[in-house]
Curated annotation (Swiss-Prot):
SMART domains the record matches: TFS2M, TFS2N, ZnF_C2C2
PANTHER family per UniProt: IP08861P-RELATED, TRANSCRIPTION FACTOR S-II ZINC FINGER DOMAIN-CONTAINING PROTEIN
Protein name per UniProt: Transcription elongation factor TFIIS
UniProt binding sites for Zn(2+): C340, C343, C368, C371
Source organism of this protein record: Arabidopsis thaliana
């Protein structure tokens, strides 16, 4: 089931990428193929566990920002459907847990039939010391049989208090065992995972005003992730510690890049700007959850730290610039009729231009594909 879901989504993703590269606006085979795959995903039965295991929900957000409006609208509808599934299953799970916690053990009641003619019962008390007392019970059955039994009752020994010390009936002191508050709290607290460090309650300072300010800015940026995360990301975000991550990032930046006022000032500014950018929630979330480690963060370029939306816009700008650049060049054709004088190969491209008067032959410009040798002739 998970593999089928991944295959369907990968097909839609490839078609959407092809449509974005080709610059298709609303029609085309890639757009139709992507929309058909997304409609199949709408009918595909998914659960919260399936979405978490395959992580297709995170990848679907890029299609919800696609430049083609048809793909964008269908992907947005599919994302809303999956969000409803996650919310409903989470609510059911919480309701089930609450029901199980409040459920009390049921006691089966047995009906007792009262005898119509109760038989007379004789009770005789027999004393046996101070600590116990026996009672002789005689009951006469309807068939004139007498049933005799002995019931023993024990007295609860009295405990006397003398000068703050409790003394039982045997004259021995009774010790009160008290549980300290620390032990009580440790007994009540649930056991934490051994490999998960506890969350910091306050930011660790290093007695350097500049470094402490950078840590405060990082904590402020990472704490915003909790309000930006989706429902299926909230569990991993809540398990992360923004204070500890901020301290780790700043410490590694200081260790590898030096002070923020030194030679790596621009690198500091680039990292801080992208982490605090309101349009770049993806980078903050990946750093907080550990998808991007502090070691990897300081090696990323400004383009790598950009948001998914910004990366897509940059790719479109590059494609358009490359297309505009090549549009002004002369059209070239491939041929094997020319032999390169440098490498002897016949893999060449050529184009012709009118460089002299109209009644003169055109000038042919040839380029060797193998060694990039250029020559011309008339």
């Amino acid at each position: 089931m998970e593999s089928d879901l991944i295959d369907l989504f990968e097909g839609a993703k490839k078609a959407a990428d092809a449509a974005a590269l080709d610059g298709v606006t609303s029609s085309g085979p890639e757009v139709s193929q992507c929309i058909d795959a997304l409609k199949q995903l709408k009918k595909f039965p998914v659960t919260y566990d399936t979405l978490v295991a395959t992580q297709v929900g995170k990848k679907l957000r890029s299609l919800a920002k696609h430049p083609v409006e048809d793909i964008k609208s269908v992907a947005t509808d599919l994302l809303e459907i999956w969000k409803k599934v996650v919310i409903e299953e989470t609510a059911k799970a919480k309701k089930t847990e609450g029901t199980n916690g409040c459920k009390e053990a049921k006691v089966n009641k047995m009906d007792v039939e009262k005898p119509s003619n109760p038989a007379p019962v004789k009770v005789q008390k027999l004393q046996r010391g101070d600590s116990a007392k026996s009672i002789k019970v005689e009951r006469k059955e309807p068939d004139n049989k007498v049933v005799t039994g002995v019931k023993i009752e024990r007295k609860v020994p009295d405990i006397k208090v003398t000068n703050g010390t409790k003394i039982d009936y045997r004259g021995q002191a009774v010790k009160d065992e008290k549980v300290s508050k620390d032990n009580q709290s440790s007994m009540k607290a649930p056991a934490k995972a051994a490999n998960a460090p506890p969350k910091l309650t306050a930011m660790l300072k290093c007695n350097d005003p500049v470094r402490d300010k950078i840590r405060e800015l990082l904590v402020e940026a990472l704490c915003r992730v909790a309000g930006e995360a989706d429902d299926y990301e909230r569990e991993s975000v809540n398990a992360s510690d923004p204070l500890r991550v901020a301290v780790s990032v700043e410490s590694l930046m200081f260790e590898k890049l030096g002070r923020s006022t030194g030679a790596q000032k621009l690198k500091y500014r680039s990292i801080m700007f992208n982490l605090r950018d309101s349009n770049n929630p993806d980078l903050r979330r990946r750093v907080l959850t550990g998808e991007i480690s502090p070691e990897k963060l300081i090696t990323l370029s400004a383009e790598d730290m950009a948001s998914d939306k910004r990366k897509q816009e940059n790719n479109q700008i590059k494609e358009k610039a490359l297309f505009d650049c090549e549009r002004g060049l002369a059209a070239k054709a491939s041929t094997d009729q020319f032999k390169c004088g440098r490498c002897g190969q016949r893999k060449c491209t050529y184009y012709q231009m009118q460089t002299r008067s109209a009644d003169e032959p055109m000038t042919t410009y040839v380029t060797c594909v193998n060694c990039d040798n250029h020559w011309k002739f008339c």
